[in-house]
Structures are given as structure tokens and as C-alpha cells.
From Swiss-Prot:
Pfam families hit by this protein: RNA_pol_Rpb2_1, RNA_pol_Rpb2_2, RNA_pol_Rpb2_3, RNA_pol_Rpb2_45, RNA_pol_Rpb2_6, RNA_pol_Rpb2_7
Record flagged with keyword Ion transport: no
Gene name in the database record: rpoB
SUPFAM superfamilies: beta and beta-prime subunits of DNA dependent RNA-polymerase (SSF64484)
Protein name: DNA-directed RNA polymerase subunit beta
EC code: 2.7.7.6
Catalytic reactions on record: RNA(n) + a ribonucleoside 5'-triphosphate = RNA(n+1) + diphosphate
GO biological process terms on file: DNA-templated transcription
Protein origin, superkingdom: Bacteria
Alphabetized GO MF terms: DNA binding; DNA-directed RNA polymerase activity; ribonucleoside binding
Natural source organism: Bacillus mycoides (strain KBAB4) (Bacillus weihenstephanensis)
Metal-binding found in the keyword field: no
Gene3D superfamilies from the UniProt entry: 2.40.50.100, 2.40.50.150, 3.90.1100.10, DNA-directed RNA polymerase, subunit 2, domain 6, RNA polymerase alpha subunit dimerisation domain, RNA polymerase Rpb2, domain 2
Compositional bias ranges of the Basic and acidic residues kind: 1162-1177
Length: 1177
């Protein structure tokens, strides 16, 4: 036997074929959501209030400060919020202090700032009763970026951009004449020296001293028309504010507000970190030759003589001095925008290809502290210096698609940005109120208007592109949705503008973003998934773990470092499958490793790090595909995506051939019930599990409090699947923290179970599995193998109308007793009733307009004292295809104190449950992207059977394998068969699973034939088939695309208002479009009458279609068609363009077009007692 036994949770053992021992546990898979939101509550909110406070009025007399904040307790629990359609939120209270500087009076108050949505334990939000997920956004990090460009003459130039988090952009570029220009905030370009002069370096000499003498600078100075700081300031002002009279003061204040005002220009922590890193002097000194001697200013010791080449070792030696004081210069700008000195660090080196003739200045920004979030003159000088250095081949250009230059905005930051918008709107209101109200009687509460804050938060959760309705089809879909990374959304890319490069897999994605899991279609590459081991650091960069190699001994240690993409670029990383000795020494001399995206073979001394696990490359969903290494990546992509569409079955099975990820995925998804504290199980019911805690008191373990875990039973998920939890522990079990107490949907014994293990044969059968179709045995229908439960919710509300309130009642006009048999005395359907399409769910009547009474009605009214009620039937009925059994009914009444929308007095919700067996037309798939539609369900006796008489369950077409190159399914098939014979479950982790020899070994152990095939007998004749057939156990899942949801038919129904043609689509109960090409087909056959009928009475000849209906009802001949409505619309359109269009008959008389009144349909319909609906488009 190969492989070793591994325990997954309490109930499942698997034989694992993994050879590489895992050094690191998988992190909590939804940590990206929970930790980000926690940061927001702890620090993000505080930062916001500090940024905005104090708010002062225009005179500086009143000052409003935000001191502290606290979140209260939510009003309802998560379950109650879902039931009542409210938001799961807690009240936010802020302590505010108002200081009157004239009188010295101080007022403090607690101000309520609205209800703030809270995150549930599983990383979701409940907004208006629906669970939503905030997807993390991938955006360009604020920083300074340099890129090379080649013009049409083949000349190499450069562009650079300083991108802040918010504020004006600075762009540098060269032109064909080697002049360096700057653009401020996307305006027309200026020579870069104009900006330098405006900063206070007014003369040519100062600029040359700063940047060093070079031809690019002299070209730029020639182009520059200004010669002093004042002129430069005026020049810039004219560019930024054309048409306004320029003054030096205005120009200064404009530049200050654009770049040096923290309220208008913000780099954020991450921008400051990136700029300091990029513009630090050490990066440009590496491997360069010094053109000056470096001396320690304190001791006078020579650190590096002129002409020294600064290799890694020398640079590391002088780095502490570089950080401290070497090359520090203080530039003194005169009369520039910013008063005060500019700290710089400048060192001269020889230009790389000048053989020591030309020296260039390298200016760094002297590492500005992290507190300064705006750009400084030092940054601008250093960024210009870097640009000139690039022209002499010193420094690197940046790759914008590198994950070192893209960062994640998770929930916390997205919320913070939204909250900032609300607060800044509120700030304006506060300022205005300060100047209007009486200063003595004023209070903080009277100043603060919380409306804009609440509105901006509501808007974010309700309508932001990144706030999405949670995909709850199954636990894997839930988990993946929370780990999704989107490049779309506000401040991100748009589908149309995103090019090929942004979407492509990049080497820096390794271990950070999954190269496989992404949608097919227009969003490919823009929506990604976080890799299994990845984490997000404080700056929002994705990090991946690596095992450190000790540089002294060369041994791989157990210590794990998380590296960002740009840190990883400095190291050589070995793969996880390198052979190691007991102590961690590399056994091979030559090692395959990665360095900056290149695969290299190098000696073991050069290795700095090693991968922690083979599956760190892929996401959670992709890691659930066994034998992923044997599948083509296009098919693996489909496999990963289709697992998320698996419908939860009534009795699911976890896969016989799994990957070991099933347990972790299920546990972290939030669908299972997890034990919070260790203890012993005291009671187990369908709806509840009681755990008595163990508490440690003076070294003794004693019984403590009782924890009661509630199960969710038969709840409708967001996608209409059934969400049901069932306990898997027994009374007396000792449970530990983090253990699974109850399975959720699509789980078995604590493991993910999306489908069932079925017996599959690769063979054709009368052509029924042509083009990926699937032939299935009737046993799978009879034994409810692929039966799923679907729950739909229908609601009806009784409102106040102008003519009086609507009423929910059993007394409905023109409805017989038979139709009311399942309604209770209130007029609401009873629980457990079986309903079909069109049945009543809630009886409701709406008052009609009061008409003039006839003599008879007046007489009746006089006798019985009440007018016959003028109401019309507006009851809720079961829509087409919605029949089933009533699972539950919920009634909310305004009188009982339930919160209802304005104008609604009563709300009734009915839940209908359907049990759907698998049928022809349903879509099924394996885990390797092998999908198909069921074409035929055969009786069990007609299915081919094995020599022992067992009929197979499913037949797949063997032609689906070779061209698709997903051989993983064949290996799974054989290994699954062997495992079923042996009665074991298997774990074959991705990239470290069962090899070919392991599979053959297990096949032999199971006593199967040595070609792993078998003879099959035809169930119809009993004859054996000509060739041996591959038969085995494959894990097949039923997908959410079910034929019941797609089948649709209509005779009459709603029509579009303008064209009077039937609406389209199942949701609108529309018709089938008979389009242009279908018309050609009938024309080609010369079927004139059929065609005329289709274009008139079956579509938009309004009078004709009612008459036709009448003729059919009365059994008469169908009348002559009239003029279609769309023809009238066309004529009206032409008339509206000013043309005089008339319709003439054959004998040259004008045909009068009668404008159809809205009532036409209804008048004719009333005569016939037919229902006709007209709907607005």
C-alpha cells in the first residue's frame, strides 16, 4: 500500500498520496473580510474623525472636535434581520466637543451618527434582509511610476507619473528633441525647469547644481522662457487657470492647495511607503561607480573611495550611513511655493556607459517620515532626478501589472472612503450652521446633520458595484465570493478599457492570485480569486508565505516569511517539491528555482527561500480538483467555476477521490456550525446542539456555562436553494474549539459534498451521448440520487390606496369555493397545502373607483343598507412553474408593531418548496470541466452492466477526453473504482497527488484488471460489447442550470405598450421572437399565409388578435388580418420627421388609420371574458 492515512475532522479518514509535508496550516479562508472590517472598527473610524476634526467656522471662533466613538448593540439578531427584511446594524455614537473661543465655553455631547451595518461572523452583511458580500478591489497603488516608450523613429524616451490616492497628478515626459516636460493635473505640458523654478530654484545655476550638468537639462533650459521664480509661478497659473488674471500670490496658493495641502492631496500610508521605497537613493547606487569619495561626516572616515563599484556587499556596508547622514544636502529655495529648506540626499556617480567621463547626480528624497501624507518638494526633486537618471540608464522602469504595484482595497478601506465622503458633506453643513445660528445657544447636536453620512453608507451597501448579492448556491460559492478580487468598480478599470496585459497571468501572481479561477467571457482576468495561502498586509499588498533558507548553513528552516511581490523579486525561490534531508538540506546540487519570473537552474548556495506548499499557487476552489496537474488549464478553469454552481442535493456524498481541501473549505465557508469553546455535547436535536463548556480553575477542569448552537432548518438561500443544517455529533462527544458540530448544505460529515460518486462508463450508446450529452440510468431518479430541494418566496402587501385600504380576505369576487379550499379564514394559504400554477396564495381585494349607481343598485342599497362592494381581485397567485408545497407563511401587521414600509398595512410571505428530481435537459458536470446535458434517462435494465450484474449509472462519450486534454477525469475514474473496491476514501492534493505508479499500485491492490478496463454487457440483448470499456467511479455534480427553470410556453400574455408586440423572456412571460432570419426561412418556402399570420394576428394586429381569439373560442374561421401596430408606429415616426405619409389601398383610396385606444383590447376582451395584460416596456 502506498500513501498514509490522514484524519479530516472527527468522522473521515482518507488515504493521502501527498509526499511533501505541510509546514504551514492553511490560514482562515475568510480572514481577508473579517480582519479588514475589524481594522475599520478599531482604527479606520478613528482616523476619519481625526482627519476631519476640528471643524472651525469662517471666523475661527467656534471649533467642533470629535473625541471618541462607540458602537452599541444591534437591535435584532442576524436571523431576525433576515426574517424582518431589516439591516443588521448597530447604533454609532460619537462624543463631540464644541469650544467657543471668545467665551471659553466648552460643551460636550454624545451624538447619534446613524445605524452602522455590522459584519456577521461569516464575513457577510445583512442589508434589508439579504446577505451581501463586499468584494475586495484591485487598484493601482499610489506611487511614482516610470515607463519607457519608443517613438515612431525608434527613439527611446520615458514617461513618469506621480499618482496619489486622491489629488492632482504630476507627469513627466521627453519629446523628440530631448526636452523634459511636466504636466500638472493633465493640463498642457511645460518644461520641467518651470516647476523647479516655481519651487524656489529660480536661476539656471541653482538648477544645474542640483541636477548636475547634462544635455537633457540644457535642452530643457533652452526651451524654458522663464528666468525667475515669479515668472515660473505666473506661467504655471496661466496653464492651470487660463483666462484668470495671474498674480504671484494666487499662483503660490494654487500650487500649495494642489500639492501641499493634506486635505486636498493624499498619498495615504501606502503611497508614502511606495514613494520612499522608489525614490530612496540606494536602489540607484547598486552596481554603479562612484564619482566622489564617501566620507562619514562624524568621524571623517573614508567609507568608499571615488571609482568604487557599489556591489551588494559594499552597499550593505554603507547602508547604515546612507540612512543616517551621507550626502545629505539642504537646498534653500528662495521665494518658492513652500517656505523652509528642502532636505535632500545627493551622490555623484559615473554614467554607466560613459567610461568615467560623465558624472551624474543621484538625488534621493531623504526618507520623509510616514506622517507626511502629501507630496513634498523633496519628493518632486527626487522624482525629477530619477527621470534624468533613467535617461542615462540608471534606475528601473516599472511594470504596472506587477502585483507590487497593484494593491487591494478590502471592505474596511472601501467603507472608510465612503464614510469620508459622508463626513466631508457633513462638514460643509456644520460650517454653514455655525455662521447662521446664535453662538450662545448653539449645541453640537444642533450643528451636526447626520443625513449625508447615513446616505453615503446606504448608497455604498445598496448600489456600489463592489457590494454584491452573495452567491449562496453552495458553501464553495459562498467562500469563493468572499475571497474574490475585482479590478472593476469605482476607481478601477472598466471592461471596455481593460486591455490584454491587465487580464493576463503575471509571474508576480504566483501564490497570491489564482491563475486558473476567473470567469469566462468579458470579465476574464479582471475578476480573480485569492490563492489559498495568501494574506493581505497593512498596505493592501498581497503576500505569500515562503520557508526561509538559512544563509549560513544552507538548510531549509521551519521559519515562514510572508513576502510581497516586490520583496520576492530580490530573492531566488526554490519549489516546494525539492528533495530535502531530515535536517532540511537540499539533496540535489542543481535546483530548479524562480527569480523575477524566470525559471532557472542554479546551485543550492544561491537559494534564499522555498515554497511552503505545492497548492499555494491556486485558489480554494481550484484546489478541490484532484489530478489538476493532468488537466489542461482551460478545462480546469471551467471545473473550478462549475463547482460553484453545484446545487445542494438531498443526501450528498463527499468525493471518494478528494484533495484534502474539502474539510477546510467547508469549515471556513460559514455554512457549517462551528464549536466556539471546548466542552462536552449534552443534547442533540434537529434544531439545536447543547455543549457544556469546560473551564480551567486552578489546574482543575470543571463544567462551566452551556452553549446552545441553533441550526438553520430549510431556509431559502439567496439563489433559491435549500439551506439546511444537521448535527453530526452525538451526546457525550468531547468537542474542541473550531470543530464542526453540524453539516450545512452540500456537506457530509464535515466535508464539502457538492455531488455524488457514481459508476461511469466511457462509451457511446446509439449516439445518445453525441456532443457531450449524458446518458443516465433511471436508478438515479428513483433513488433520489440527484434530487434537490428548491424554495421560492412570494409576497403580497396590503397598501393604502387613494380609494381606501386594500384588504387581505377570503371573500374575493367571482372566485368559487373550490379555489378557496386551501385558504384559512384570513384568506391566507395554509402550511402544507399542495399548490399548482395559478392557485391562490393570498386573497386580496383593492377598492375600485366609485361609479354612479343604477336604479336597481339604489333599491338594493335602500333595502340592505349597504352598497354592493366595488372591489377588484388583486390576489397573489402561484406563477407558472412555481407549484409545490407550502413550507411556511409569515404575516407582518402594522397593528402588531412590525416595521413595514410606509403605506403598507400588512405583508404576507409564502414559501413554496419544490422537490426536483433530475430530468432530461438538466446540466451536469465533473470536476475537470467535463460538462454535458442529460439527453436520455434509460430504464435500469437497458443500461450496460458489469460482469457481476451491476448496471452502470452514467455513460459519457469517450470523444470528450482527447481534444479537451482533461486526462484528470480518467485518472479519477480508475482510482475511484479501486477505492470503492477497497472501501476507502482518498486524498490526492493538487501538484502533489497520486502519481501514475500510485494509481496502478492501488488498482492492483484492489484486484482490478491490469488495463483497468472491464467487459460490459448490453442491457438490452445481454451480449458483451466488442471492446473492453473504461468503467469507474467519478464524482458528478448537478448544476444550477435546470430545465425546470428554463422551460417556458405562452399562448396569450402581456404586450409591449408602444409596438403592441409580445414581451420577451421567461421573466416577463413573453413569447418566442420570430426574427428576421426566421422570416427569410418562411419566405424561401413561399409560405405566405403562415407568414402573414405570424406578422399580424399572432403579434401586433391588436384588433385582429382579439377577433382571432373569439373565432377560435366560437369555432369559426379566422378573420382577415388588419394593420399591424408597429406599421402605425413607423408611419407616426415618419410623420414626426415632417414627412406626409398616407396609406393607400389598391384602388387608390386612402385608408384611415384608427388610433387604437388603450381600451380596445379590454373592450373586446370584456365581451369574451378573456384576460389581456398590457405592460410598459
Amino acid at each position: 500500500m502506498t500513501g498514509q492515512l490522514v484524519q479530516y475532522g472527527r468522522h473521515r479518514q482518507r488515504r493521502s498520496y501527498a509526499r511533501i509535508s505541510e509546514v504551514l496550516e492553511l490560514p482562515n479562508l475568510i480572514e481577508i473580510q473579517t480582519s479588514s472590517y475589524q481594522w475599520f472598527l478599531d482604527e479606520g473610524l478613528r482616523e476619519m474623525f481625526q482627519d476631519i476634526s476640528p471643524i472651525e467656522d469662517f471666523t475661527g471662533n467656534l471649533s467642533l472636535e470629535f473625541i471618541d466613538y462607540s458602537l452599541g448593540e444591534p437591535k435584532y439578531s442576524v436571523e431576525e434581520c433576515k426574517e424582518r427584511d431589516v439591516t443588521y446594524a448597530a447604533p454609532l455614537r460619537v462624543k463631540v466637543r464644541l469650544i467657543n473661543k471668545e467665551t471659553g465655553e466648552v460643551k460636550e455631547q454624545d451624538v447619534f451618527m446613524g445605524d452602522f451595518p455590522l459584519m456577521t461572523e461569516t464575513g457577510t452583511f445583512v442589508i434589508n434582509g439579504a446577505e451581501r458580500v463586499i468584494v475586495s478591489q484591485l487598484v493601482r497603488s499610489p506611487s511614482v511610476y516610470y515607463s519607457g516608450k519608443v517613438d515612431k523613429n525608434g527613439k527611446r524616451g520615458f514617461t513618469a507619473t506621480v499618482i496619489p490616492n486622491r489629488g492632482a497628478w504630476l507627469e513627466y515626459e521627453t519629446d523628440a528633441k530631448d526636452v523634459v516636460y511636466v504636466r500638472i493635473d493633465r493640463t498642457r505640458k511645460l518644461p520641467v525647469t518651470v516647476l523647479l523654478r516655481a519651487l524656489g530654484f529660480g536661476s539656471d545655476q541653482e538648477i544645474t547644481e542640483l541636477l548636475g550638468d547634462n544635455e537633457y537639462l540644457s535642452n530643457t533650459l533652452e526651451k524654458d522662457n522663464t528666468d525667475s521664480t515669479e515668472k515660473a509661478l505666473l506661467e504655471i497659473y496661466e496653464r492651470l487657470r487660463p483666462g484668470e488674471p495671474p498674480t504671484v500670490e494666487n499662483a503660490k496658493s494654487l500650487l500649495v492647495s494642489r500639492f501641499f495641502d493634506p486635505k486636498r492631496y493624499d498619498l495615504a500610508n501606502v503611497g508614502r511607503y511606495k514613494i520612499n521605497k522608489k525614490l530612496h537613493i540606494k536602489n540607484r547606487l547598486f552596481n554603479q561607480r562612484l564619482a566622489e569619495t564617501l566620507v562619514d561626516p562624524e568621524t571623517g572616515e573614508i567609507l568608499a573611495a571615488e571609482g568604487t563599484v557599489l556591489d551588494r556587499r559594499t552597499l550593505d556596508r554603507i547602508l547604515p550611513y546612507l540612512e543616517k547622514n551621507i550626502g545629505f544636502k539642504t537646498a534653500k529655495p528662495m521665494g518658492g511655493v513652500v517656505a523652509g529648506d528642502v532636505e535632500l540626499q545627493s551622490i555623484k556617480i559615473y554614467a554607466p556607459e560613459s567610461e568615467g567621463e560623465r558624472s551624474i547626480n543621484v538625488i534621493g528624497n531623504a526618507n520623509i517620515t510616514r506622517d507626511i501624507k502629501h507630496i513634498t518638494p523633496g519628493d518632486i526633486l527626487a522624482s525629477i532626478s530619477y527621470f534624468f537618471n533613467l535617461l542615462y540608464k540608471v534606475g528601473d522602469t516599472d511594470d504596472i501589472d506587477h502585483l507590487g504595484n497593484r494593491r487591494l482595497r478590502s471592505v474596511g478601506e472601501l467603507l472608510q472612503n465612503q464614510f469620508r465622503i459622508g463626513l466631508s458633506r457633513m462638514e460643509r453643513v456644520v460650517r454653514e450652521r455655525m455662521s447662521i445660528q446664535d453662538t450662545n445657544a448653539i449645541t453640537p447636536q444642533a450643528l451636526i446633520n447626520i443625513r449625508p453620512v447615513i446616505a453615503s453608507i446606504k448608497e455604498f451597501f445598496g448600489s456600489s458595484q463592489l457590494s454584491q448579492f452573495m452567491d449562496q448556491t453552495n458553501p464553495l460559492a459562498e467562500l469563493t465570493h468572499k475571497r474574490r478580487l475585482s479590478a472593476l468598480g469605482p476607481g478601477g478599470l472598466t471592461r471596455e478599457r481593460a486591455g490584454f496585459e491587465v487580464r493576463d497571468v503575471h509571474y508576480s501572481h504566483y501564490g497570491r492570485m489564482c491563475p486558473i479561477e476567473t470567469p469566462e467571457g468579458p470579465n476574464i482576468g479582471l475578476i480573480n480569486s485569492l490563492s489559498s495561502f495568501a494574506k493581505v498586509n497593512e498596505f493592501g499588498f498581497i503576500e505569500t508565505p515562503y520557508r526561509r533558507v538559512d544563509p549560513e548553513t544552507g538548510l531549509v528552516t521551519g521559519q515562514v516569511d510572508y513576502l510581497t511581490a516586490d520583496e520576492e523579486d530580490n530573492y531566488v525561490v526554490a519549489q516546494a517539491n525539492m528533495k530535502l534531508s531530515e535536517v532540511g538540506e537540499f539533496l540535489d546540487e542543481d535546483i530548479v528555482a524562480r527569480f523575477r519570473g524566470e525559471n532557472i537552474v542554479t546551485n543550492k548556495e544561491r537559494i534564499d527561500y522555498m515554497d511552503v506548499s505545492p497548492k499555494q499557487v491556486v485558489s480554494a476552489a481550484t484546489a478541490c480538483i484532484p489530478f489538476l496537474e493532468n488537466d489542461d488549464s482551460n478545462r480546469a478553469l471551467m471545473g473550478a467555476n462549475m463547482q460553484r454552481q453545484a446545487v445542494p442535493l438531498i443526501n450528498p456524498e463527499s468525493p471518494i477521490v478528494g484533495t484534502g481541501m474539502e474539510y477546510v473549505s467547508a469549515k471556513d465557508s460559514g455554512a457549517a456550525v462551528i464549536c466556539k469553546q471546548p466542552g462536552v455535547v449534552e443534547r442533540v436535536e434537529a434544531r439545536e446542539v447543547w455543549v457544556r463548556r469546560y473551564v480551567d480553575v486552578d489546574g482543575q477542569t470543571v463544567k462551566g456555562d452551556l452553549d446552545r448552537y441553533k441550526m438553520q432548518k430549510f431556509i431559502r438561500s439567496n439563489q433559491g436553494t435549500c439551506y439546511n443544517q444537521r448535527p453530526i455529533v452525538s451526546v457525550g462527544d468531547q468537542v474542541v474549539k473550531g470543530e464542526i458540530l453540524a453539516d450545512g448544505p452540500s456537506m457530509e460529515l464535515g466535508e464539502l459534498a457538492l455531488g455524488r460518486n457514481v459508476l461511469v462508463g466511457f462509451m457511446t450508446w446509439d449516439g445518445y451521448n453525441y456532443e457531450d450529452a449524458i446518458i443516465m440510468s433511471e436508478r438515479l431518479v428513483k433513488d433520489d440520487v440527484y434530487t434537490s430541494i428548491h424554495i421560492e418566496e412570494y409576497e403580497s402587501e396590503a397598501r393604502d390606496t387613494k380609494l381606501g385600504p386594500e384588504e387581505i380576505t377570503r371573500d374575493i369576487p367571482n372566485v368559487g369555493e373550490d379555489a378557496l379550499r386551501n385558504l384559512d379564514e384570513r384568506g391566507i394559504i395554509r402550511v402544507g397545502a399542495e399548490v399548482k400554477d395559478g392557485d391562490l396564495l393570498v386573497g386580496k381585494v383593492t377598492p375600485k373607483g366609485v361609479t354612479e349607481l343604477t336604479a336597481e343598485e339604489r333599491l338594493l342599497h335602500a333595502i340592505f343598507g349597504e352598497k354592493a362592494r366595488e372591489v377588484r381581485d388583486t390576489s397573489l397567485r402561484v406563477p407558472h412553474g412555481g407549484g409545490g408545497i407550502i413550507l411556511d407563511v409569515k404575516v407582518f401587521n402594522r397593528e402588531d408593531g412590525d416595521e413595514l414600509p410606509p403605506g403598507v398595512n400588512q405583508l404576507v410571505r409564502a414559501y413554496i418548496v419544490q422537490k426536483r428530481k433530475i430530468s432530461e435537459g438538466d446540466k451536469m458536470a465533473g470536476r475537470h470541466g467535463n460538462k454535458g446535458v442529460i439527453s436520455r434517462i434509460l430504464p435500469e435494465e437497458d443500461m450496460p452492466y458489469l460482469p457481476d450484474g451491476t448496471p452502470i449509472d452514467i455513460m459519457l462519450n469517450p470523444l470528450g477526453v482527447p481534444s479537451r486534454m482533461n486526462i484528470g477525469q480518467v485518472l479519477e475514474l480508475h482510482l475511484g473504482m479501486a477505492a470503492r473496491y477497497l472501501g476507502i476514501h482518498i486524498a490526492t492534493p493538487v501538484f502533489d497527488g497520486a502519481r501514475e505508479e500510485d494509481v496502478w499500485g492501488t488498482i492492483e491492490e484492489a484486484g482490478m484488471a491490469n488495463d483497468a478496463k472491464t467487459i460490459l454487457y448490453d442491457g438490452r440483448t445481454g451480449e458483451p460489447f466488442d471492446n473492453r470499456v473504461s468503467v469507474g467511479v467519478m464524482y458528478m455534480i448537478k448544476l444550477a442550470h435546470m430545465v425546470d427553470d428554463k422551460l417556458h410556453a405562452r399562448s396569450t400574455g402581456p404586450y409591449s405598450l408602444v409596438t403592441q408586440q409580445p414581451l420577451g423572456g421567461k421573466a416577463q412571460f413573453g413569447g418566442q421572437r420570430f426574427g428576421e432570419m426566421e422570416v427569410w426561412a418562411l419566405e424561401a418556402y413561399g409560405a405566405a399565409y403562415t407568414l402573414q399570420e405570424i406578422l399580424t394576428v399572432k403579434s401586433d394586429d391588436v384588433i385582429g388578435r382579439v377577433k382571432t381569439y373569439e373565432a377560435i373560442v366560437k369555432g369559426e374561421n379566422v378573420p382577415e388580418p388588419g394593420v399591424p401596430e408597429s406599421f402605425k408606429v413607423l408611419i407616426k415616426e415618419l410623420q414626426s420627421l415632417g414627412m406626409d405619409v398616407k396609406m393607400m389601398s389598391i384602388n387608390d383610396t386612402e385608408i384611415e388609420m384608427r388610433d387604437t385606444e388603450d381600451d380596445d383590447d379590454h373592450q373586446s376582451a370584456d365581451k369574451l371574458n378573456v384576460e389581456v395584460e398590457t405592460t410598459k416596456e
